[in-house]
């Protein structure tokens, strides 16, 4: 019977005790010597039974040489027990909860039965156990004292008598603890406390503490430093008596006590890092050992950090040989090729097994050897199982079948190409090598359009290249990692590659209708020349004579007809911004391709550019595959570049110069801006700037200046009037999307304008309000605050240049500081989501725990989507009926069809209007991403038909309607299988919802009125194609969607954080782009959030269209504390007098007059008799009171209600201009008395505390609402005619701060439309499902247009809320979601602490996910390894055919 094999299903962690060490140890260390002569000393710490790292001797245990021996542990029998340094806290817990006399528990175990196992002992030990009586032996439990100076020493305080607990005594105490007690306190039998005190410690194998000896005998030697620690440990152990007996309370000799302490310290240093470098001869506590100039190494020190065993050796990628060099561009290479220097090709070797079919091909390599390229370096002989150097072979050496030849790399080999950081899976791609024969070349070369995969450029970037060795790995690499697989981005669902820069401009120049010289035409020979380097089948030019002229559109059409598609879209070239200043040819303002022929328009970035979703290459990829799309990119690139080389294209300084008239006009515009800025300065100096609610005068002034100094759109007019768009290279680059933007063009030609850093102008950094030393003190002109009047072409002055450099310096610092944070955030996301894998039901689960019932809620792969428009969404009821209701045949079926279309439209509107109401910036649109573009399929079918328009009859129309209806009904069975479809088993609701959007589109595009000219056979073909594409768009089984989500979110989020400065210049973010993402992914509570907001809709429809009323409501909910209304305050110590004429402080003598008036006007508010000598005098800010609409009466009423132990007097509200409103608050004696009615010795502190309470008193508003402003919203509503109308006159309240519950209590706020950006606040009020949706919307809001596909956001949200609580992507969140996956948590961070906790809890770690199998040395079950393959080796052996037998059969 043959023995089978099995995979490791789980790993259990336990505390290793004496028995475990003795069972694993192969020998006992008794002496500290290393060698005796030339061999290891027997019984020494380098005993040959523990392994070998020396080629002079073998391992005695396994009889292997140093390369094959894995090492074997030994043991050191201690003369006195030692505590386990990793579990000191656990030892203390046990000492607190068990009787030191009998080992019985002194706590009631039933009190902790309801707790989970790991919490029981911790909770029991945290209670009061001192002085308790043991239930068994009735002994009083003493107080356990942890020595504050010595980490390893415990003391017991028994009724004033203090004794030291030596490890031997602790071991005896723990030996009395029963297994039943251990289990009831939540620990495993394998984690008995007796194992926490060791009599035998393990000595690690030789292989992990190697030594080097050069020569034999007295030659130079070098051994690992940890051997010195072990030597010290053995020597100190020998100094202690063998049979040392210690009795509790007994005094032992001082030298023995010191030796015991030193041994414990040495064992600690052996396992863990030293915290200090003090010598072991003096001091106490955690003392360290110094080896030379550095602390001694430890075993656990090898685990953490990037250079540790876990991240570097176990999780890190390792290859035998790799090459690295700088990259440069080469447009002659295909996108899937890489140019490889010949010097590299002769260094890297490829192992290839000699077979009958390749021996003739390999023979030249064998004969060339190392002398000539291509050659080889060595041969592995199968018969002798030995490796031979090619230069040392004998004359009669033969290359035979089965040998392995290590040959040079040649053109056509596949290789991995990688650029770090590898933020996406496309960062590692497989290319075909093209060996560069020129020996002077030493850089890697690649097509410029291939840079997008690696986010690379040619400014000195370096990349790695390595060649897979085996045939299996080469085939696997090409199938799984070929760059064609990365053509469609998982992140954005659009194409990654396309034309860039030169080829984009070339495509435009080739396809435009006219040139400055006239028609854009060429003769036959020139057209043929363009195709020379495209490496495609050349088009037929036989029908053209040498004198015939071809335009660029015809030439491009010859190429596009090889992959016929249909395309129609406005090009980037046409812009409404440029239309007033230039003449557009009517044939160039709309690009249209019909069945592969470019009818009109030009090819620019929107059609052929990199990342153009819905562009030409995207359509080709969807219909013909990504490989064909890559070929078309290369071919188009060659056409464009060849044309540019012939026709010429350049950018010169002449393209950047303005005419004198245009320059004068630009200066007039700049002077207008400066004049407006000066007027704002004058308003500031005269005090005429009145800031709105929520802004200070300075902030509002800066905001006015920024708005005033922005270049208006009309500055483009002089630029456009001074250039010729048909010949200006700079403008053509910008207009076609090849490079640059309008602001770049303005900065180069007209002026740079205001420099901003963090949404602010340059602020004064020097004394006396100076931004730079070039400007006078307290200068207010715009130039002193970073406004640059000159353009780059005109040149900058010294201060202007410095302002520009300040902006660049801020970018550099911001990037440097953010890189580490974003890198760690990316790593946390990868580890947090890596266990999420798609199973056979297209569910996403972590091992067996469900995360998503269906991946992405629709089961679709983000790479298999297209953008389409739903025609019915924006139509009114009447428009829908006119366009989609078929009235040619009177049948209830068509009434049913129209009713279904109307219900689909209303359902779509309902869903996305709800999303619009609960998202700050996501408006309803009729454009969505779906897996199948039905309209394109219908158009392609009709264009490929040769029968023309056929007459239609009633029977065929009804049959087609029935076909579509049945197809839509059965579409969800795509998620199940054909058997269930034939049986018509019930479809789960979530699968019906998954296909609902696709069914809506099918019913729209295949409505009866749109398919009258389609035959039943064509309809059948259309439905088959839809089903095929829909099935191919489903996510694959075993896909690691968690990692895909982490990569797709982390990469653009990293870019977002690095670009936060640029975003803030445009007013898009706060001062730091990293704050909000950290708040979202860290699941911070409400009180810890810095940037929370609320959007509040008003309940009354009439009020929400009136800005004034909305502002009044905003004022009423904004939290106003008394401190915000005060100009200044004073705490006075004075004696109150009824005559009011002896006010202590002369500066406030004028208060006597209004105080007298107050008493006369308020006869019922006379001062009480118990007024104290403390008075708080406050001056109110009348401006703030007016802006906040707060009356003095409301302030006084609020203060009297909140502070009854005071007497309040105030001046009148309507004071003259310049005279403040004054409030005097006299404290009463009752405020200074305790419950004993005795006066406090000092009352100054009480008075100061009263001031703090007073200033923080709430006058009005909702707690948590720091600021409230009125904003204008744009929302959609359905009118009575069913028309989707856009309303842009709605006012809502946007708050800084959040309090959903408080806002719901306000009668003016609509409680059903309250939106808060706070995930925690949403969770508290609405529950976990609302929090999940809030995570999605907040990530989308933060990342904006650069955000990834929403399926990745769903992955984040579902994982963070899977447990019923919002968990973070930090270490704590991973512990909550996957508490049993010890190996994963250990790989993330703090491996020593994680392993210690796992051993204490006896954790069982199931092997699943990616990190855990990798650490165990197995292959994770993902991708193609997700499915098990069963192979009948016996059948294969019996039916094996040799080459000769196959030839005979042939």
Swiss-Prot record:
Sequence similarity: Belongs to the RNA polymerase beta' chain family.
Pfam name, any one: RNA_pol_Rpb1_4
Gene Ontology cellular-component annotations: DNA-directed RNA polymerase complex; virion component
Domain of life: Viruses
E.C. number(s) listed in UniProt: 2.7.7.6
Reaction catalyzed: RNA(n) + a ribonucleoside 5'-triphosphate = RNA(n+1) + diphosphate
Nucleotidyltransferase listed as a keyword: yes
Annotated protein name in UniProt: DNA-directed RNA polymerase RPB1 homolog
A molecular function GO annotation: DNA binding
InterPro entries: DNA-dir_RpoC_beta_prime, RNA_pol_asu, RNA_pol_N, RNA_pol_Rpb1_1, RNA_pol_Rpb1_3, RNA_pol_Rpb1_3_sf, RNA_pol_Rpb1_4, RNA_pol_Rpb1_5
Described purpose of this protein according to its UniProt entry: Catalytic component of the DNA-directed RNA polymerase (RNAP) that catalyzes the transcription in the cytoplasm of viral DNA into RNA using the four ribonucleoside triphosphates as substrates. Forms the polymerase active center together with RPB2. Part of the core element with the central large cleft, the clamp element that moves to open and close the cleft and the jaws that are thought to grab the incoming DNA template.
Keyword Secreted carried by entry: no
Domain remark in the UniProt entry: Lacks the typical C-terminal domain (CTD).
Any Gene Ontology biological process: DNA-templated transcription
Induction remarks: Expressed in the late phase of the viral replicative cycle.
Originating species: African swine fever virus (isolate Tick/Malawi/Lil 20-1/1983) (ASFV)
Signal peptide positions on this chain: none
Location in or out of the cell: Virion
Self-association and partners: Part of the viral DNA-directed RNA polymerase that consists of 8 polII-like subunits (RPB1, RPB2, RPB3, RPB5, RPB6, RPB7, RPB9, RPB10), a capping enzyme and a termination factor.
Swiss-Prot/TrEMBL keywords: DNA-directed RNA polymerase, Nucleotidyltransferase, Transcription, Transferase, Viral transcription, Virion
Enzyme class, broadest EC rank: transferase
Primary location: virion
